[in-house]
Amino acid sequence: MSEWELPKTVETQSIERVGGGGFAWESGVYDATVKMVYLNQSASEAVSFNIILEKNSGNFSELRENFWIKSGKAKGNKTYYTKDGKDYPLPGYSVANSMCVAVTGESLSKCMESAEKKQVNVWNPELKKEAPTERPGLMSLVGKPVKVAVHQVIEDRQAKNDKGEYVPTGASRTVNQCKFFGNAEGKTAEEITNKEPATRFDKWAQKNTGTVIDKSTKKNGSCSAADIMGSTSTDGDKGSLFQTEPPI
């Protein structure tokens, strides 16, 4: 079995719940193109699946996000976690697998076979900026169309304290979180897998388009995009996604 395949005991769960770079994309459903997908590793040995998407219309802006698909050494370098005696995929693994199925029709494990060494800009802690670095790029995904459900999220900025722990700084930033993916025809990954009609993107968009999820400690709740344009945008976030350690 490939190290990227989930064990048969792992209970997969749906990530396609309707639920309640530059300036962040507003919450909504977008047609995009996969500009790059590459792997990175944190100091704890956790592995991230890093994506760069480009809108197919409008301002053609980029969206960057990373999904943690393997836990660090302290937690066994696993693609899953155990809770109440049952095994479940890491949340990041589920979203990354959703993208792989949507774009290629194949699982994350299969897409790993297309890895090639590529130069990508990765955060360099010594230089304190992004620098060209060789990383495995998943080329079966690059240049392909994808549909994505995106949330705009306000979260705390974090910095290390005297103990080396990341804590909120009191400032916030606006970022994007990809919820799930689909193909160019509008079928989500789960609809493709289960041979179901395309309905989830429309249902999700009706409930979530234009909303903002506020996860910061300064303010909780959800509001419209127009209401939060005064908050810190991703324009000021020129640093990498990998300045902080993963939560796994």
Model-based region annotation:
Residues 1-248:
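Short beta-rich binding modules
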